[in-house]
Amino acid sequence: LPDGSFDYDGIRAGICEKTKLVTIQRSKGYCPRPTISVDAIGEAIAFCKKLRPDVVIMVDNCYGEFVETLEPTDVGADMIVGSLIKNPGGGLAPIGGYIVGKKDCVENAAFRLTSPGLGREVGASLQVLPSFYQGLFLAPTVTAGALKGAIFAANLYEKLGFKVVPSGDAPRYDIIQAIEFGTPEGLISFCEGIQYAAPVDSFVTPEPWDMPGYDSQVIMAAGAFVSGASIELSADGPIKPPYAVYFQGGLTWQHAKFGILKSLQVLVQKGLVTEEQIRKACRTTLKNTNPVEKAQNKIY
């Protein structure tokens, strides 16, 4: 539902004797709803299992790994899936995804990927396994930096008068920070600032384009070492009301902060935000909220 809760009446009506799999998407995607907490996912799983004990519950865990103490498999999910070029790859994994869960679920997925009987025992490793393991080792620290950046962005833009989801002091269940600008110019300018702060292709200016699968143009900013890695500093959003940007990532807290400040610089240069607004917001944010300490306390 729009408020991030589950439509239990709809779930009850939807699960029938033919239902084999129920999927839950943890993160918000391009929806304005809040991200779903692991506790809320656990309650939904218990509800589904009460209706059909044999139904398989699969959770799309993208952007949520290492944000909370528990993962969906700790609260009853049969399997979780995600991307290695997001949180769990630590910015080092160049490709790949993961499937974690009960043995039979993982085996069935592997058989579907390759062939029955062979499963995950075959396939090229592409000589990237060391990057997978090293990225996984660094992933909690990298995710912590991304969380700090999201909290900083939320507090700063909230003080500037923009609607942010989640708010600066709200609990965090993934690394994504949404900021609603109300105009396409604000959304585009923010993405330009993020791109200009990138370690790769910082000379490029992102522009909206007709991306397949979307009902509006989409703009994306990501000067990343790994193509498509949204655990690196990145931002994107559809060019339609409320003109919200979805900001995430930053391999270090310092780079995330730099990208956010760069986005403000572009907004000032285009006259969308005044320098006095920013000075006032910075003073208020630094006085009332220390996003670094808050994020550290949440994680550690």
Where are these regions (language model features)?
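Conserved PLP-enzyme active-site core in the AAT-like
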Residues: 1-144, 148, 154-157, 161-165, ...
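Conserved C-terminal alpha-helix-loop-beta "cap" of PLP-dependent enzymes
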Residues: 158-291
